[in-house]
């Protein structure tokens, strides 16, 4: 008998951590929008992480233009110095968010409570 289950789980971004990351990105001069937390986000490898622990999978724009991901135009934009700058600022924002999680008990608690609320019970039983 062959049994299968999804290789990648759907994503459950942890809104309290996403909001903290957004604030940290603003501190380094990068504006960003957060998606509606009621939306479905599709599956990916980070989904497998997000069903176990609070996680984020936010997006930063590398250009002011709307360019489809995984396209030749996106590859060209990713090779520009502006994209490198966004990557560096993104790393700064992630580091700041990690530090916030280490130092801020209320953020950790909010993340844990949110995670418990949004991840379906059938994942918790595995």
Explain the meaning of each model-derived region.
Residues 1-126:
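Metal-dependent amide/peptide-bond hydrolase catalytic core
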């Amino acid at each position: 008998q062959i049994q299968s289950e999804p290789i990648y789980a759907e994503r459950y971004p942890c809104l309290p951590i996403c909001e903290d990351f957004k604030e940290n990105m603003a501190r380094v001069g990068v504006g960003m929008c957060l998606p509606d937390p009621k939306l479905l986000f599709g599956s990916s490898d980070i989904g497998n992480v997000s069903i176990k622990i609070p996680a984020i999978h936010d997006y930063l724009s590398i250009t002011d233009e709307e360019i489809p991901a995984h396209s030749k135009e996106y590859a060209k934009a990713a090779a520009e110095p502006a994209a490198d700058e966004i990557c560096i600022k993104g790393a700064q924002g992630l580091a700041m968010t990690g530090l916030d999680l280490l130092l801020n008990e209320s953020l950790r608690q909010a993340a844990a409570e949110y995670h418990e609320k949004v991840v379906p019970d059938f994942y918790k039983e595995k």
